[in-house]
A protein has these predicted regions:
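HIT superfamily nucleotide-processing domains
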Residues: 1-217
Length: 217
């Protein structure tokens, strides 16, 4: 059985994994390999978990929330707005992958994405709303694949469920479709599949790492 690409990367310290931006006992932050926003990072669990409910069930939600708020506060202090967190969630009993490219718990934080929440709410009527991680934990997960999305200016957590499954990198595609030409040129991403990190060989340079570290640390 092949090892999870994130577990392998964390263990062997390869590629972007030798350039963490910030870490705690159980989580580590990396820059996204192909950013879809002016600021785009991943929070990844060091151990192999599948989804947010795994994190809640092992009691790591307070540590995760502390990291989320740290990043959010740092972004606000640097003048960023419209900060959103999202996860492509795979239900354990699902035969599909929930739109995840890698089946290892990770959430994205993106900034300056004013249309994302609005677009999701217009496009998807199946929305479950939680006001805290405690509420989510009591719900004990969902049986189908989902999108977990939070506007970090609020405590509200939205879970969008999709009976027909979720396309791979679905939110990345939404962000790419909403991206201005100026930002696309700045991020150097073009083409019909410009959102697909698997088709790009973009290298995370030390300059990029330094840019993110100055914001986060």
């Amino acid at each position: 059985m092949n090892e999870c690409v994130l577990c392998e990367g964390l263990k062997n310290n390869r590629e972007i994994f030798n350039r963490p931006l910030y870490e705690t006992d159980n989580f580590v932050i990396f820059p996204d390999r192909l950013p879809m926003a002016d600021f785009h990072i991943l929070i990844v669990s060091k151990k192999h978990y599948i989804n947010i409910w795994d994190i809640l069930n092992v009691g790591l939600e307070l540590e995760l929330e502390k990291i989320i708020q740290h990043v959010n506060n740092r972004l606000i202090s640097h003048g960023y707005k419209n900060i959103v967190l999202f996860e492509h969630g795979k239900a354990h009993k699902s035969e599909t992958n929930g739109g995840k490219s890698v089946e290892h718990f990770h959430v994205h934080i993106v900034a300056e994405v004013p249309l994302l929440m609005q677009t999701l709410k217009k496009s998807h009527s199946e929305i479950i709303v939680y006001n805290s991680f405690d509420e989510m934990k009591k719900a004990q997960g969902v049986l189908i694949d989902y999108l977990y999305v939070r506007d970090l200016s609020s405590s509200v957590m939205s879970v969008f469920t999709m009976e027909n499954g979720i396309a791979s990198q679905y939110i990345r595609l939404l962000l790419y479709s909403q991206m201005s030409k100026t930002l696309a040129e700045k991020l150097q991403i073009t083409g019909e599949y410009g959102f697909d990190w698997k088709t790009h060989d973009k290298v995370i340079t030390p300059n990029i790492v330094d840019f993110y570290k100055k914001i986060i640390i």
